[in-house]
């Protein structure tokens, strides 16, 4: 059986120090760090955020999508 933790698919994404303060849906540069190339929100185990921070980031990403600042999906590769 493979060791899941050493799998190359689950390598942690280094985002440096997690953000300080509040998350805003207008801060697109920050939110793009927590979105995959396909446009999906990255999970906590990859981003290294706390549960509270992850909920705030997810909510901000969803708000930015509804306003039109972020795409729902990335169609560049298709």
UniProtKB/Swiss-Prot annotation:
Gene Ontology biological-process entries: translation
**Per the UniProt entry, what species is this protein from, by scientific name?**
Oltmannsiellopsis viridis
Q: State the oligomer form and interacting partners.
A: Part of the 30S ribosomal subunit.
Residue intervals passing through the bilayer = none
For this protein, the record's Pfam families field holds:
Ribosomal_S18
Molecular functions per Gene Ontology: small ribosomal subunit rRNA binding; structural constituent of ribosome
Write the lineage as a comma-separated list: Eukaryota, Viridiplantae, Chlorophyta, Ulvophyceae, Oltmannsiellopsidales
Keyword Lipid metabolism present in the record's keywords: the answer is no
Establish whether keyword RNA-binding is in the entry: yes
Indicate the family of this protein.
Belongs to the bacterial ribosomal protein bS18 family.
Identify this protein by name: Small ribosomal subunit protein bS18c
**Cellular compartments annotated:** Plastid, Chloroplast
* One Gene Ontology cellular component annotation held by this UniProt entry: chloroplast
Q: What does the UniProt keyword field contain?
A: Chloroplast, Plastid, Ribonucleoprotein, Ribosomal protein, RNA-binding, rRNA-binding
Q: What is its main location?
A: plastid
Q: Record's InterPro entries?
A: Ribosomal_bS18, Ribosomal_bS18_sf
């Amino acid at each position: 059986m493979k060791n899941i933790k050493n799998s190359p698919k689950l390598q942690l994404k280094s985002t440096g120090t997690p953000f300080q303060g509040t998350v805003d849906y207008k801060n697109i540069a920050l939110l793009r760090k927590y979105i995959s190339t396909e446009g999906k929100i990255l999970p906590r185990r990859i981003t290294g955020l706390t549960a509270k921070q992850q909920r705030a980031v997810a909510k901000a990403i969803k708000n930015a999508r509804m306003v039109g600042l972020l795409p729902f999906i990335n169609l560049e590769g298709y």
